[in-house]
Amino acid sequence: MSRALLKYIRLSPTKARLVARQVQGMNAEIAIASLEFTPNKAARVISKVIASAVANGGYDAQDVIILSCRVDAGPVLRRFMPRAKGRATPIRKPMAHILVEVGTQKSVQQSVQSTKAKAKGAKNIKSEDSKNSLKVTESKADSKVDAAQKASTTQEKAESKTKVAKAKVATTKSTATRKTTKKKTEGEEK
């Protein structure tokens, strides 16, 4: 597997990603040929980076697959354009970093097989860990039940306190309305 990186290219990363997605997983020779006829600045740049990655690995372009073609955002040049009434509006000139990784079909198949073997080994380790974790989860479940019971009792206490508080508010309102009605009736009698 070899790679090539082109940094600080004056190109919009969003426009370059459209081309990069088309190329990913293709044969390098076919990708370069198709990019030659794509009327896009990003296509010309990405084809050069693919050719560089193939040359870096010392491969023949017919035997190589593009494993990944990634376009990351670089810094943005900020310029200003003068406008009417003394104003200026910003102009963004973005840059991009392009990373291409290529590999032969044989190396790709070997890496896939090795990752499958690693995954099988990890499953065996996980099954042993799951037996131990069952014991831990049982003790955690017991503690959660205790916590839930405590929470329900505290919630019941809080609900009873709110009922008492609401009753007090209701009695104070009724006494206040009685006092105001007494004052009104006394005022009418005078």
Swiss-Prot record:
InterPro entries: Ribosomal_uL22, Ribosomal_uL22_bac/chlpt-type, Ribosomal_uL22_bac/org-type, Ribosomal_uL22_CS, Ribosomal_uL22_sf. One of its GO terms (biological process) is translation. SUPFAM superfamilies: Ribosomal protein L22. Keywords: Ribonucleoprotein, Ribosomal protein, RNA-binding, rRNA-binding. Residues 125-147 have a biased composition (Basic and acidic residues). The keyword RNA-binding applies. Residues 167-178 have a biased composition (Low complexity). GO terms for cellular component: cytosolic large ribosomal subunit. Signal peptide: none annotated. Residues 111-190 are annotated as: Disordered. One of its GO terms (molecular function) is rRNA binding. Pfam families: Ribosomal_L22. It comes from the Bacteria. The keyword Transmembrane does not apply. Belongs to the universal ribosomal protein uL22 family. This protein binds specifically to 23S rRNA; its binding is stimulated by other ribosomal proteins, e.g. L4, L17, and L20. It is important during the early stages of 50S assembly. It makes multiple contacts with different domains of the 23S rRNA in the assembled 50S subunit and ribosome. The globular domain of the protein is located near the polypeptide exit tunnel on the outside of the subunit, while an extended beta-hairpin is found that lines the wall of the exit tunnel in the center of the 70S ribosome. Part of the 50S ribosomal subunit. This is Large ribosomal subunit protein uL22.
